[in-house]
Amino acid sequence: MATYLIGDVHGCYDELIALLHKVEFTPGKDTLWLTGDLVARGPGSLDVLRYVKSLGDSVRLVLGNHDLHLLAVFAGISRNKPKDRLTPLLEAPDADELLNWLRRQPLLQIDKEKKLVMAHAGITPQWDLQTAKECARDVEAVLSSDSYPFFLDAMYGDMPNNWSPELRGLGRLRFITNAFTRMRFCFPNGQLDMYSKESPEEAPAPLKPWFAIPGPVAEEYNIAFGHWASLEGKGTPEGIYALDTGCCWGGTLTCLRWEDKQYFVQPSNRHKDLSEGEAVAS
């Protein structure tokens, strides 16, 4: 019985299936953890959602920013961008079923026995685990309710960018969403910077990657995350696992077998068109 952690799939269905075949993943015996951003950019978002949903209790996933954006597109709040290649999913006969399932997925996964937590972008150093759990539940409750379109309409934005237990309403929900799904850099006090996307080496002072700032969760738990493909899975402290290695951009899809910490990779079926800055079919 093995636990496999896989980084952002981004619609790369063929690579996902090839990687699972490589590690001999067996639903019902093994468990698959996914860092979110199941959809967008790659050609197979529909197949990815259908497959992941079919795994039932054999999968544990977290929502990423692209998954939330898909829900906003489906709700008529955001525009369907051609580069996201979501039209086959949005027009599928089972789109309602798939997307209503998706919006009921969590932002945070915790395994106390393994001392493992997973969130798409990571865990802000301003939170302890109890706060992270409560914050995740706040957003999950709204997403799974009939009022979820109102939240999706208000989730876009970069403020507030500093946590306070006194935050209320949509501002609180927006901060939580950004921390779980969009965070990369923080100021030394843990305040989020939502603008910088470069590599840690190129970030302006005093910004630091969120995982470079000591926080209570990282003191007790391992943290697995995706979202930050330019890290290429490198440069994190012990116990912090960056799993997005840019499959949809021509990189690889990465899997970590938790029990022995062995990595497996599946090369992308796509290549990066440097002139366009977009992944195109090879």
Curated annotation (Swiss-Prot):
Keyword Hydrolase listed: yes
Disulphide linkage map: none
Keyword presence, tRNA processing: no
InterPro entries found in the cross-reference section: ApaH (IPR004617), Calcineurin-like_PHP_ApaH (IPR004843), Metallo-depent_PP-like (IPR029052)
Pfam families: Metallophos
Alphabetic keyword roster: Hydrolase
EC number per UniProt: 3.6.1.41
GO molecular function terms attached to this record: bis(5'-nucleosyl)-tetraphosphatase (symmetrical) activity
Reactions performed catalytically: P(1),P(4)-bis(5'-adenosyl) tetraphosphate + H2O = 2 ADP + 2 H(+)
Annotated function: Hydrolyzes diadenosine 5',5'''-P1,P4-tetraphosphate to yield ADP.
HAMAP family: ApaH
Entry's family note: Belongs to the Ap4A hydrolase family.
Protein name from the UniProt record: Bis(5'-nucleosyl)-tetraphosphatase, symmetrical
